[in-house]
Amino acid sequence: MLDEEERITMSHELGRLEDLPQDYRDELKQLNLVPLWPSLRAVLPPNVPTRQTQPTYWSYQTLKPLLLKAGELTPIEKAERRVLVLANPGHGLEKMQASAAIYLGMQLLLPGEWAPSHRHTPNAVRMIVEGEGAYTTVDGEKCPMSRGDLILTPTGLWHEHGHDGNEPVVWLDVLDLPLVYYMEASYHIDGERQQVDPGRGDCAWTRAGVVPTPVFQRSDKRYPLLRYPWADTRAALLSLAADQPEQECVQVTYVNPETGDDAENILGFYALMLKPGQTLRLPVRSPAVVFHQIEGRSEARIAESTFALREADTCCAPGYTEVTLKNLSADQPSFIFMADESPLHRKLGVFENRG
């Protein structure tokens, strides 16, 4: 006689594919049919989703020589975009994704090079890692590139990269490519070199709460601000820390200055300042998160993994995972850029914050 616990356990043991007769399985396969119950627990597991994203770390000092070597081996004409992809082994390196919805790549542009104009369906941002003299022209607006700047190249907008300086420039590409590719909606269109228009969004939208209104007209641009200078973001973090010293988490979000919405509609982007010696435990949330060290040194504890982040290092954490960040300096702040899947999760109604 089975007791209650054994009956409950057995009731949750679903039938296996190999339990079915081979001729029945063959007939299903011939008709493009699949029985659900052998795979039901894999696609609908209890309490926490099945995650292929693994805690993963990329050292910039390790990958930089390989990126520069790519510059020697492959001219820009043969690469179009010279990138080393930061691939999460949990998804398989051939998938070229950091998480379910995030693609990361370190891109190199050498002096005098020009990456031709194109547009594509995935959204992208560029977090500038090092170097001066390069620029991205987006929808006719020329955006200079300096370390820590965030530059948007949203879906459907023409963009190209040029370099008038004398040293290599490197930036971190962050795209929602895995999601758009999975939806079978990913493609690009080549274009002609853009004509640069006068004016820049990062000059017109410079103060919170104040927006341009020529003859009482608000901007109708979907993305009025394309470049978020690091100097402004850093100053905002320092000001916030000084104004609210009791606040544990000093963090800002990159937003559309006209609407207050996230800067792009699939991925969210943030800048975080850790005070000297500070340890910060982040809430356990549903979206995966990427961390990129802009300034300083930090330690990231992601589940059972611990990574020491130096400037330009990057790591990622799967969703539903405990993350603790620590500033390894006792006298200097640490600045971290973050990207996550929050906007997507909120739009789909699956966002969770478990505290």
From Swiss-Prot:
UniProt superkingdom: Bacteria
Reaction equations catalysed: 2,5-dihydroxybenzoate + O2 = 3-maleylpyruvate + H(+)
Keywords, comma-separated and alphabetical: Aromatic hydrocarbons catabolism, Dioxygenase, Oxidoreductase, Plasmid
EC identifiers of the protein: 1.13.11.4
Broadest EC class assigned to this enzyme: oxidoreductase
GO biological process entries: naphthalene catabolic process
Molecular function via GO: gentisate 1,2-dioxygenase activity
Ranges for domain Cupin type-2: 106-174
Pathway as given in its UniProt record: Aromatic compound metabolism; naphthalene degradation
InterPro entries cross-referenced by the UniProt entry: Cupin_2 (IPR013096), GDO-like (IPR047183), RmlC-like_jellyroll (IPR014710), RmlC_Cupin_sf (IPR011051)
UniProt KW Nucleotide-binding keyword: no
Record function comment: Catalyzes the oxygen-dependent ring fission of gentisate between the carboxyl and proximal hydroxyl groups at positions 1 and 2 of the aromatic ring to form maleylpyruvate. Can also catalyze oxidation of alkyl- and halogenated gentisates. Exhibits higher affinity for 3-substituted gentisates than for gentisate but has higher activity with gentisate.
Family under the similarity heading: Belongs to the gentisate 1,2-dioxygenase family.
PANTHER family in UniProt: 1,2-DIOXYGENASE PROTEIN-RELATED (PTHR41517), CUPIN (PTHR41517:SF1)
UniProt name for this protein: Gentisate 1,2-dioxygenase
